[in-house]
Amino acid sequence: MTSHENDKDRVNDQSLVGRHQSIGDDPAEGVTKPTYAAGAVLWRGDADDPEVGIIHRPSYGDWSLPKGKLDPGENLPGVAEREIREETGYTVRLGKLVGSVSYPVTGRTKLVWYWTAEVLGGEFAPNDEVDELRWVGMDEAEELLTYDLDVDVLRKARKRLSREPDTRIIYIRHGRAHSRKNWAGDDNLRPLDKKGRRQAELLISQTLPFRPERIYSAEPDRCRHTVEPLAGELGLDVTVDPLFGDMAWIGSQVEAQNRFMDVVAEGGVSVICAQGTVIPDTIAWLSANGTLPIADIPCKKGSAWVLGFNDGVLTTADYYSSALPVK
């Protein structure tokens, strides 16, 4: 076993607490010489009693959770999905952000973010990095894993899977648009600027791993244009409805709330792209009427909230402040 893997259990830091997690603009804030990585607790079957996939890495002689380093130009959900596919051959749907761990690796600090990831398809084939994958129950997985730190991640994932949401809403604020003060026409027609168009393109790799089935947008063009690249990649239409926008929230709040809950009732995974007033207000309303207190509700342009619901009640919330590359 290499020295840096020994350090993983001897010296580490964890952020694995809570049904509300977030990834900020600078995920390694305060860390010098960070190495970014992402992975997942791979699961299949019944979320209440799942089998989990544990990999064997011949180069380390260990049993661990699938993960890998981030390449330049990637965001963290995108690298988690890619690494799982490369190491295991499986297509997955990312779910709850379990949190992050960090530990020293040869003069640097390795930071690893983990999600739950449900297997949708594919087949494992031994490769240079992973020569065996075992599907085992949670208790057996704890015994099989080489590192205590991985066991801690697994236990947190087990807790989250014990109440796996039946619905997820990916609530996106539109990308950056041209300045309102320099726009003389209809504000609904104000377009994305260069950065906003880049945000829209990068939202593809951040959002695809969650496998959305429907895409909705508020009326302004900047909302629709933010999710059109994603819709094109998925082969989905963008359903535009003014009830998802700021004006509807201000003028017809109950109707806007009912429309949002209509999407929740559809189940599965949906994307809604909206604006900077309605998103935090809606989340505050959901929090007040659910089981998940959220004190601070940021809503940067190009950001996304992944909201989990059980029987129409908000139970989990993860905030991704930016789809732009981490490095």
Model-derived regions, located:
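Acidic, metal-coordinating catalytic segment for phosphate/diphosphate chemistry
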Residues: 2-39
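Nudix hydrolase/Nudix homology domain
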Residues: 2-4, 61-62, 124-179, 183, ...
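Short, well-ordered beta-strand micro-motif
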Residues: 42, 56, 114-118, 135, ...
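Conserved Nudix-box catalytic region and its N-terminal flanking loop in Nudix hydrolases
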Residues: 48-91, 183-190, 195
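Active-site-proximal alpha-helix that buttresses catalytic centers in soluble enzyme cores
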Residues: 68-70, 79, 166-251, 280, ...
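Unchanged
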Residues: 70-93, 101-152
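A short coil-to-beta-strand element that immediately follows conserved catalytic motifs
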Residues: 91-99, 237-241
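Active-site-adjacent alpha-helix immediately C-terminal to a catalytic or transition-state-stabilizing loop
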Residues: 257-314
